[in-house]
């Protein structure tokens, strides 16, 4: 699972995900990628699941780049606990994805049909709507 080594603050406000992404909207390393269409929170377990799905579909060939990292803590109070008495403990970590952000990339030494298949399988595992992008289209 992806968890930051150090964090400036233990807990953060909930906040809102507004606007489009400022950076990370183009392919930098590979030739095929997964780009978000809508805003949402991607948990560290989603990132790990997608990494495993892509690597299994590609049969360990090619290279995968994960372009995001979960850096926002999400706190939760236990069940059967009354309101008040402070904020709950950190439950998991998320990446707040804005529309237009590239999440994953795959190298060009994989055939396009196989890369598209792997990334379409990965789309089903993510909580945000995504689309397949490539340098060749």
UniProtKB/Swiss-Prot annotation:
GO biological process terms held by the UniProt record: translation
GO terms assigned for molecular function: rRNA binding; structural constituent of ribosome; tRNA binding
PROSITE patterns reported for this sequence: RIBOSOMAL_L16_1, RIBOSOMAL_L16_2
Assigned keywords, A-Z: Ribonucleoprotein, Ribosomal protein, RNA-binding, rRNA-binding, tRNA-binding
GO CC, alphabetical: cytosolic large ribosomal subunit
Free-text function comment from the UniProt entry: Binds 23S rRNA and is also seen to make contacts with the A and possibly P site tRNAs.
Subunit and interaction comment: Part of the 50S ribosomal subunit.
PANTHER family per UniProt: 50S/60S RIBOSOMAL PROTEIN L16 (PTHR12220), LARGE RIBOSOMAL SUBUNIT PROTEIN UL16M (PTHR12220:SF13)
Family: Belongs to the universal ribosomal protein uL16 family.
Record-linked HAMAP family: Ribosomal_uL16
Protein name, UniProt field: Large ribosomal subunit protein uL16
Species of origin: Wolbachia sp. subsp. Brugia malayi (strain TRS)
Gene behind this protein: rplP
């Amino acid at each position: 699972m992806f968890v930051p080594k150090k964090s400036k603050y233990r807990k953060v406000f909930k906040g809102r995900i507004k606007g489009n992404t400022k950076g990370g909207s183009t392919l930098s390393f590979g030739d095929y990628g997964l780009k978000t269409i809508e805003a949402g929170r991607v948990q560290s377990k989603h990132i790990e699941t997608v990494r495993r799905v892509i690597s299994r579909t590609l049969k360990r060939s090619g290279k995968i780049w994960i372009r995001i990292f979960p850096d926002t803590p999400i706190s939760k109070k236990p069940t059967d606990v009354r309101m008040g008495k402070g904020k709950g403990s950190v439950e998991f970590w998320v990446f707040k994805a804005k529309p237009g952000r590239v999440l994953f990339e795959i190298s060009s030494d994989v055939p396009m049909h196989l890369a598209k298949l792997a990334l379409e399988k990965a789309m089903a595992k993510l909580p945000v709507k995504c689309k397949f992008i490539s340098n060749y289209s």
